Structure formats: structure tokens, C-alpha cells
Amino acid sequence: MDVRESISLQNQVSMNLAKHVITTVSQNSNVIFSPASINVVLSIIAAGSAGATKDQILSFLKFSSTDQLNSFSSEIVSAVLADGSANGGPKLSVANGAWIDKSLSFKPSFKQLLEDSYKAASNQADFQSKAVEVIAEVNSWAEKETNGLITEVLPEGSADSMTKLIFANALYFKGTWNEKFDESLTQEGEFHLLDGNKVTAPFMTSKKKQYVSAYDGFKVLGLPYLQGQDKRQFSMYFYLPDANNGLSDLLDKIVSTPGFLDNHIPRRQVKVREFKIPKFKFSFGFDASNVLKGLGLTSPFSGEEGLTEMVESPEMGKNLCVSNIFHKACIEVNEEGTEAAAASAGVIKLRGLLMEEDEIDFVADHPFLLVVTENITGVVLFIGQVVDPLH
């Protein structure tokens, strides 16, 4: 299976995850998360698992072996998620970290995989007597790696004396629009909420041609980021239902249509009569383990087979399971571009149709979905929904 095919399958997993997050965690509020971040943490857990746990994660992520998964993840980390700011592209930073209790040690083969494939730093920690300090250490690490955007990926009390292992992943993205918006043209306007009420929000606009396509029941806008000297091309896509309350139906359509994202990319610039998109800034956090369990990924959290390929002690490995995968992301969209960050931490404890028009409108004055994608590979960095640009 080639990388592009693998990514297409990953995107199906990501959109399914997005639907589950939105419907179970936060149907009526803004959502932003990074499927790329969550997939990296799951990949690391799979690499340290055996038996049913390994098989279930591989099946969930649609891979046939851990070797295939590791080489795919390694390629994504090094090729797609590499920083491009030095050559004029988006600032991108991905970091992985592992904290293991001082009573345990990683298997040398697993530690090497962490360092080589996932560029992950491993740290010893004293969970027995200093769990609070370890939480603070992980959070300050996430803050540093996300340029200060995320200050708390692990909530208070998320680790205790029973905790043996924490994996964390942080992803930071800052891109400048290829065509910046003129700040003097930004005006207040009405945004329609899901409950029928309205709020007044600042809307950006432009008279320039835009990458917009109209489909049956929705429109898609692509805003490209300034590209660096490498081949990567990042864009933010806005999926805007025609109906003010059409977000849920659009999400269903995206999830139930294989290859939806790849097949609904606006390829040409068109004249736009009325063009308005809101400015917004928000953060969103959730426990991804609950969502993953709801999607059938249960073995890593039950400790049936343990994480025997991670640690030197086979007996201790059998009793290790994942207790939580905490995820936090934030995003800001303004005239200059986008700043976004996400961090995930997995805590492991000891068991106790297309219509072409010459000119169209694109007025995002009601709830919409957004996706940040690398266009050459199709890798999805962030998925979200904006239901209220003020919150």
C-alpha cells in the first residue's frame, strides 16, 4: 500500500473520529483537534503492544503490521510535519515525549523506535511520590513545544502513584495566507447560531478571486498558505452547508462518502460576489480515550494483553494499560493567517454533485467545518467546527 493510499484511509478514520467527537463530546460548541496527533500516540502504543491490543489498533488505523505503521508514521513525521519556516513556508513543529516511572525501563528496541521513527525523547519520572510535579513537567513541555499556545494538556489529577507511563504529542502550526486579508476591510456582521440566535462577529473579506466550488447542498473554500521552497502546500478548507443548520447533515455526508475530502477540493479560482469569513480563536480539549472506546478501540484501555513490547519487565508489561489519551488543541484565524496547536497525552497506569458557476457567493455566516491539509499528500493536520466565532 503506497503512502497516498494509506493517507486516504487515515483521513476516513480521522473524519469518523471527528463525527464521534462532535456528536458525543461537543455538538453545540466549537471543536478543534488534530487527528495527526492522536494517530501518532496510537501508533506508539501499537508499537509497544502485542496480541489483541496490537491487532485492534492496527485494524482501527487500517494497517496490516506495526512495521508498515511505523514506517508510515516515520515518513509523515519527517516529511510532512517538518518545519518549513526557514525556507519561507509555515512554521511547523511536532514533538513526541515519553515519561516512564523510575521503577521501569523501556526495552532498548522500543526506546530506539521512539527515537528513530517518532523523534520522541524519553524521560524517567517519579510517579510514586511526585506525580503532581510530573504533570507540571509534561504541561510545561507541551507549552514550550506549542509556542505557549497550550499550557495544560494533562488536567490536574490525571496522574497519580499508580501511573507508570505517559506519552505526549504536541503539534504547532503557524501559516501565513498566500493572499493576506486587508484588515481595513474587516467589518462586523451577523453570525447565525445553531439555536436560531445571532451574534455580531468580525468578518474578513476580499475582492480577489478565490478557490471556491459549489456542490449539492454545500460549498467549499480553500485558502492556501504561503508556500516555502519545498514541495509541500498547506491549505485551510471551509466546508459550508447551504442551510444555516446543515452542519450535522454535511458531516454525515462526509463520513459516509469514501474519499470525500480528496474529491471536493476547489481546483480553480473564481470570482466571488459576496465573500465573508469570520475571524475566530478558540481552544478545545477532550479525553480521546472515551471517543476511541466508543468507536470500538477497547483493548489498549482494558489491559487484556498488556503492553509487553514496551518495558523490560514482562510481568509488569502484562499489567500495563492505557488509562487516558488527553488531547488539547487551539486555533486562531485572522487576516494574516492561522495559528494552531494540538497536544495529546496518553496516560498508562497499572491495572487496579459538482455545479460550476462563473460567480458565486461564499458567506460563512453560519456554522461550518474546517480542515487544515497538506495538499500534495492529503495529510489532515486539524479538523474542527465553528458554531460561534466569538467563543
Curated annotation (Swiss-Prot):
Gene3D superfamilies: Alpha-1-antitrypsin, domain 1, Antithrombin, subunit I, domain 2. Pfam families: Serpin (PF00079). Residues 337-361 are annotated as: RCL. Signal peptide: none annotated. Changing R351A: Much less efficient in metacaspase-9 inhibition. Inhibits metacaspase-9 (MC9) cysteine protease. Functions through cleavage of its reactive center loop and covalent binding to MC9. Involved in the control of elicitor-stimulated programmed cell death (PCD). During infection by the necrotrophic fungal pathogen Botrytis cinerea, functions to protect cells by limiting the PCD-promoting protease RD21A activity that is released from the ER body or vacuole to the cytoplasm. Involved in the control of water stress-induced cell death by limiting the pro-death protease RD21A activity that is released from the vacuole to the cytoplasm. This is Serpin-ZX. It comes from Arabidopsis thaliana.
